[in-house]
Curated annotation (Swiss-Prot):
This is Ribosome maturation factor RimM. It is found in: Cytoplasm. Its main location: cytoplasm. An accessory protein needed during the final step in the assembly of 30S ribosomal subunit, possibly for assembly of the head region. Essential for efficient processing of 16S rRNA. May be needed both before and after RbfA during the maturation of 16S rRNA. It has affinity for free ribosomal 30S subunits but not for 70S ribosomes. The gene is rimM. The lineage of its organism: Bacteria, Pseudomonadati, Pseudomonadota, Gammaproteobacteria, Alteromonadales.
Length: 175
């Protein structure tokens, strides 16, 4: 991977489960079980990254619970509730003809007609589709400071070129 590896959030700890220190785990990965395959798994506590050693995990209801090494009672595990689970970005699989949402941050966005709409600063998750937040250029002819562009493949998003950091959209610049 060309970028320096940086920790990427792939899940978080939920509520404590039982009295022996088990925790609910919310996975953000495409295949939810794959969160347990990443090594090392990290958590950020008090501004510091620490390795998470999972002794065991199992399916529970619609999710998972995990037993973390060194957290043997409910009260100890309570300190982990809400902490994010991360993995170094270089541990993520390379995508041949696809990309991660994080790869879109910093991409230039242009209309199919070549108008420069600005740069992607973040991606918002909505119920129906994700939305690109595009910071407009300071000299935007339409006076826009920011644009919200739905990420709808083929209908709004014409092309994504991660190598060139360019997203081409079917979008009116004055909208």
């Amino acid at each position: 991977m060309s970028k320096k590896a940086e920790p990427i959030v792939i899940g978080k700890f939920g509520a404590v489960h039982g009295i022996k220190g088990w925790l609910k785990v919310h996975s953000y990965t495409d295949d939810p079980e794959s969160i347990f395959e990443y090594k090392p798994l990290l958590m950020k506590s008090k501004g510091q990254f620490q390795e998470v050693n999972i002794a065991d995990w199992k399916r529970h209801s619609n999710g998972f619970v995990a037993k973390i090494v060194g957290f043997d009672v409910r009260e100890e595990a309570q300190a982990l509730v809400g902490l994010e689970l991360l993995v170094d970005s270089d541990k993520l699989p390379n995508l041949e003809e696809d990309f991660y949402w994080r790869d879109l941050i910093g991409c230039q966005v242009k209309t199919d007609n070549g108008y420069d709409l600005g740069v992607v600063t973040e991606i918002m998750e909505t119920g129906s589709n994700d939305v690109l937040v595009v910071k407009a250029n300071s000299n935007d002819a339409f006076g826009q400071k920011e644009r919200l562009i739905p990420f709808i493949d083929k209908q709004v998003i014409s092309n994504v070129d991660i190598t060139s950091k360019l997203i081409q959209v079917n979008w009116e610049p004055d909208f």
